[in-house]
Amino acid sequence: MAKDPLAEAGLHFDELNKLRVLEPDVSQKTTELKEECEEFVDKIGQFQKIVGGLIELVDELAKEAETEKMKAIGARNLLKSVEKQREAQHQQLQALIAEKKMQLERYRIEYEALQKVEAEQSEFIDQFILQK
Amino acid sequence: MRLKTSLLKEPKHRELVSCVGWTSADELYSCSDDHQILKWNLLSNDTSVVVKLQDEIYPIDLHWFPKTVSGKKQAVAEIFALTSSDGKLHLVSKSGRIEKSVEAHRGAVLAGRWNYDGTALITAGEDGQLKIWSKSGMLRSTLAQQGTPVYSVAWAPDSGRVLYTSGRQLVVKPLQPNSKVLQWKAHDGVILKVDWSAVNDLILSGGEDCKYKVWDSYGRLLFSSAPHDYPITSVAWAPDGELFAMGSFHTLRLCDKTGWSYSLEKPSTGSLLSLCWSADGTQLAGACGNGHVLFAHIVEQRWEWKNFEITLTKRRTMQVRNVLNDAVDVLEFRDRVIKASLAHGHLVVTTSLQCYVYSAKNWNTPLIFDLKEGTVSLIVQAERHFLLVDGAEVYVYSYEGRLISSPKSPGMRMDILNSQSISLSNDTIAIRDTTDERVVFLFEAQTGKAIGDGKPLIHKIEVVLIALDQCGSSNDRRIALIDKNRDLYLTSVRKLGRAHSIYKIGSMVDTMAWNDSANILCGIQDNRFTVWYYPSVVFVDKDLLPKTIFTKDSSEFSRPPQMVSYVGSQVTVRRVDGSLVCTAVSPYPTLLHEYTSSARWEDALRICRFAKDQTLWSCLAGLAVANRELSTAEVAYAAIGEIDKVQYINFIKDLPSKDSCLAHILLFSGHVQEAEATLLQANLIYHAIQIHINLYSWDRALELAVKYKTHVDTVLAHRHKFLQDFGKQETNKRFLQYSEGVEVDWEKIQAKIEMEFAKERERAANSSVRSSVSVRR
């Protein structure tokens, strides 16, 4: 076939007989490329979304792990401090007990003295009655 | 007794509270590191911010200007001193306005205290300096300078000395330059707080060695506590000097002045950085390390007398329990109870406005009267009336609520009197001077005037404790006193023309008390419990004193104990550890005193015969001689084997006239001068001379003879005989001079003496028969 003068002039007709500047092959391929590119962008977008979600998820997990870790540390500390608190309370109660013991000792001494007085007095009364 | 504490749920301050101070009994100011000064009203339970200080002011110490300034009393304090960590001293008004700020120290100002009369302020700084400021905040002087910070400072009761901390040491420095500084090592750690009570002159210190200690003003240790778990961060004397409070981490303790602890509280306050008592001594406030302000008041205080037991159950409520039948009465008051006293069958209670007087027979209807000032710091009771120390004055009221008298003495600070420096009996008030402790002022209770010529009793050295006897007539009123050397003296209050004779009746006496129903004295002498059954015996027959004393071992009391009461035949003593120990004294001496005071001599003799006790007989002998009851005295002296005295009494009984009888009884008691005066007054001059001849006081005998121009030869003759007997030469110039002109003729002298006796007999016969009978009865 002879060379199409139009083709030489760089003009082509497509299937719909519309005048085109590009060769139909090239044009088709271009379109295909474009479509493929779009597809690729879409896929990349999707991939990004998925990865983003994943990252978020992992982040959340990390956060949760962190709080749990803090909680665990806190609990451990609390346990320790309860021990200390108990010790302090124990100390306080011991001090109070010591105080009460001292008071008891004072009362005991007073009671003994009073008992002695009572004995002396009853002895005196007996003596008094006997002599009369 | 214990402290009832109250804390709010949430602290009002955001940061630690560093200091607190009362303005009145119901209003408190507190300062905190959040730069706020809060005012707490306890009546309305309001808390309001007085002022927010500048951000660079971190308050450290606050002290209100004293209310009593030179006797004049202000209703409320108007200004306070505030020290801060930036080295400044601020004078702040009640409304919170900073009147004056001065650069006081380098580094923080750790303490600031007004003296008792408000004329000076002392500040102590981290730079180790002590500075004294005038009332208006002008620097007067730098009292001391040292290498370590001064954490705490306190004024002496007389405001003439200052106590401050120096690391582990305490220093007492007089304001006067060049006077002696007292310094001693007090604690094993840094001392954080000190306080000095104006009333009992005792020093309190607390430090990082977790102990608190009580010292006297000479630096002698009286009490040291067991170590606590945390350092002692605050100590404070109650205004009446009977109690103190001590604060530490989560710890508040109420202690007696002798150091033992009444109660321990464990409030969640953090460290108690500062403690402050209200002026009436009923409320305590504490500055807490966790931003709280702690309030506390005393409850469960107890009073006992015979079969009654009274407990302060709440601030305004008392419970009276009769132990015999378990009857319980509840007494309600309109205001807070400030002071109470139970003795002699009456309960006296003071609140901030009124005084209530209850009789033990009737707890329903008290007698109520209004108080003059309303800050009663001391109540002393006697059988017929009671005494209130109210602010700067002393008032004596009858149990019917009538004001009897108000003794005054210029220059005396009545507000710092305590139970050891004042004593009351039915007719007399004795008050130890507050400036010169050797002086004891004596007043008539009925009029409030000074007794006799108004001269006070002045002892050789400082008097520690005074006590008046409670029974008998006012002319026989005796005062017992213990001085600084722990010697016990007895003297009579009304001297009636005689010289003040003061007798030492005991040594190493720690404490003593008179009985409430007889003039019997008991005390702890040299570790032995001692009862002077009849201490006044020293005025009639000194030799009898050791025989009228009853002693028993007092190891059960420990040393040094305190006498709480001596009621009836029961003595109550408080040991050093705070326990009360009762001991019984024989009831016979009380009975004996009762019989002799109502002149039932037969009964007195019978009781002595019944008890068969030498001490009792000695007592009776003394009592009989004091009452000129010769026949009883004779029996009593015979019973204790004092034959010489029996003989002398017989001789006295045979004397013809009343006057010579009286003179010889005086002579029997060793009162030569009075005996001589009695005889001279009765114109029995020869007898007076004879007394002196018998006592070998030749000079006085000759003096009398020459003065009355009679019996000069008698004196010379006796003197001559005396010298001859001892083979001596006459050296006395007066005798040499008179012997020249006088001839000694024994016969003539004998005749003259006979004549004197005859004359006396004649005169006695002429005088009314009745009087001579009464003498010889």
Swiss-Prot record, chain A:
InterPro entries: FT20 (IPR028172). GO terms for cellular component: acrosomal vesicle; axoneme; centriole; centrosome; ciliary basal body; ciliary base; cytoplasm; Golgi apparatus. It comes from the Eukaryota. Its main location: Golgi. GO terms for biological process: cell differentiation; cilium assembly; intraciliary transport; protein localization to cilium; regulation of platelet-derived growth factor receptor-alpha signaling pathway; spermatogenesis. Keywords: Cell projection, Cilium biogenesis/degradation, Coiled coil, Cytoplasm, Cytoplasmic vesicle, Cytoskeleton, Differentiation, Golgi apparatus, Spermatogenesis. It is found in: Golgi apparatus, cis-Golgi network; Cytoplasm, Cytoskeleton, Microtubule organizing center, Centrosome, Centriole; Cell projection, Cilium; Golgi apparatus. It holds the Pfam family IFT20. Residues 74-123 form a coiled coil. Involved in ciliary process assembly. May play a role in the trafficking of ciliary membrane proteins from the Golgi complex to the cilium. Regulates the platelet-derived growth factor receptor-alpha (PDGFRA) signaling pathway. Plays an important role in spermatogenesis, particularly spermiogenesis, when germ cells form flagella. This is Intraflagellar transport protein 20 homolog.
